Amino acid sequence: MSENLNSEKEFVQEQYKKLLNEVKEHGNVLITHIGELSQNVISVLESEVEEKVTGLELAKGPVKKIFFISVETLQNMLIHGHKGNAGEQQNFFILLKTDSCINIISANLVANDAIHTLEKQIHVINSFDDEKALKAYYLEHLESNTMSDKGGAGLGFITIAMKSANK
């Protein structure tokens, strides 16, 4: 294992531990995952999310939204997360229930040269105060058919923002 991979892995593990300790003070951790993702791991996590969230006795609408956002988040991390020289990714995912809401917390490494573009994209999405304006932005983005080098059209964050109504 390369020194860089060790440092990336250690960095993600350190951030995960800090965040997990912090969020435990504010709610009940329903699901947690740290490490690599694959379609098989995502399938297991999807089942866990479905089981945990349906057990909360929430209305069907919020359950569907939580499930959708969880799956979209996991897929985004798998597809777009930075891969080290050995092809490994460092990710984490936490599903937390507080008294007032469900939080989906995720993290993955991003290549340094992608940080500015990603920050800009998130800033634009978060700048919308109106659902209709965000939906118009989504449709405009969809019609432009701009694909990334990883095959995405940049719609994941937008759909998450639209579904959650809480950026």
Summary of predicted features, one role per range:
Residues F11-Q15:
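Active-site Tyr-X1-5-Lys
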Residues I34-I42:
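Short, contiguous, helix-prone interaction/anchoring segments in small proteins
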Residues S47-V71, E143-K150:
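Conserved short strand/loop->alpha-helix "switch" segment adjacent to the catalytic nucleotide/phosphoryl-transfer site
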Residues S2-E10, L20-T32, V44, H80-K167:
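Conserved beta-strand-loop-beta-strand hairpin that lines the nucleotide-binding pocket
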